[in-house]
Design a protein with these regions (language model features):
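SAM-dependent Rossmann-like transferase core, predominantly class I methyltransferases
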Residues: 1-56
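Conserved SAM/SAH cofactor-binding pocket of Class I
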Residues: 39-127
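A short glycine-rich, Lys/Arg-flanked "PGG" loop and its adjoining helix->strand segment in the class I
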Residues: 142-155
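Conserved SAM-binding loop
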Residues: 82, 161, 182
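Short beta->alpha hinge that forms the Motif I/post-I loop of the SAM-binding pocket
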Residues: 84-88, 141, 164-165
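A short SAM/SAH-binding and catalytic strip from SAM-dependent methyltransferases
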Residues: 124-136
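Conserved beta-strand signature within the Rossmann-like core of class I S-adenosyl-L-methionine
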Residues: 156-162
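Class I S-adenosyl-L-methionine
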Residues: 1-18, 164-197
Length: 197
């Protein structure tokens, strides 16, 4: 057995920070995408100006909080919840909110889906659903998140989702949430808006 002490002056490599188009991301440890703005989130955010103005919004599976921070900056009247089950993600998201000056309007919670959120409490849910669990590819996570979103949305509320186009989530979104329209599509991703009936 061999143990070493930290190298003097090496410092803790976490958290890391990066700025993308004026949006500061802060990442701790294993938060998805780290300080990068993943391509799905980047594509969803190109439609930020078309998203409804919500008083109560949720960033479901928030990761480092990029979507919540961007929405909060664009919509100062909104109050948001940023939710993720990962401790690294929620710690990162809290710091991202502080770095972007929106911490007083975005409550970051560690939750499995939206289990702690009341029914009918949101006007808008924003989602970039994971399709990996560890190293395994899975399509089982997204439908559960769609159901959580449907439960917390008020009638007429919207779920905006970005997803890898090959996953073809639209029929599930129609069945679980409600009428779904395509907002945009590129070579890899689709953005949809589903209205809770």
């Amino acid at each position: 057995l061999h143990a070493e002490v930290p190298v003097p002056g090496a410092g803790d490599p976490w958290p890391r920070r990066a700025v993308h188009d004026g949006l500061t991301l802060v990442a701790h440890g294993a938060a998805f995408a780290g300080t990068d703005l993943d391509v799905g989130t980047r594509f969803l955010l190109t439609f930020l100006d078309r998203m409804p103005r919500a008083r109560a919004a949720i960033d479901l599976g928030c990761g480092t909080g990029a979507i919540a921070a961007a929405y909060a900056r664009a919509h100062p009247e909104a109050r948001l919840v940023a939710s993720d089950r990962s401790a690294a993600a929620t710690t990162s998201a809290e710091q991202t909110m502080i770095a972007n000056g929106v911490a007083e309007r975005v409550r970051v919670v560690r939750d499995d889906g939206l289990g702690s959120q009341p029914d009918g409490s949101a006007d808008l849910v924003l989602l970039n659903p994971p399709f990996h669990s560890g190293n395994a590819v899975t399509e089982e996570i997204a439908p559960r998140l769609f159901a959580d979103a449907a439960r917390v949305l008020r009638p007429g509320g919207e779920l905006w989702t970005v997803w890898n186009s090959h996953l073809r989530y639209r029929p599930q979104l129609e069945r679980i949430v409600g009428t779904t329209r395509q907002i945009g599509r590129n070579a890899s991703f689709t953005v949809t808006a589903s209205v809770r009936g």
